[in-house]
Amino acid sequence: MRRQVTLCYLAALFVLAGCGGNSGSATLKVTRDRGQHVLLVARIPAGLTAMQALERKAKVTTSYGGRFVVAINGLASAPHHDWFYFVNGVEADRSAVEVRLRGGDTEWWDYRAWTNPNAPQGAP
């Protein structure tokens, strides 16, 4: 009986180790005006940082040593307008170079005014 419990425990660990993490893929979405205009949607491999994923699918201009996105595909920050990003509907609290994507994640960049800190309409 003890051996069966141990085997079941080990099997559960192997199954859980395969969930999410660096396996599978994530989704990258780039929009403007709180999600009203979709500019890009792409699948990306899990395990990349949010910045690596964005740079694989779009032309990105950064500042502050590559930690802050200034422009995506030529759409650049302007007075009172910037790029904001979310992972799974939650606004990021750190640079995209520090956030590693897991399988099933949605990375969403939205170009918008600073007037409302809420997530874009239709956030995942």
Which residue stretches match the model-derived regions?
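Sec-dependent bacterial lipoprotein signal peptides
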Residues: 1-18
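Ubiquitin-like/PB1-type beta-grasp interaction modules and other compact soluble beta-rich domains
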Residues: 2, 18-124
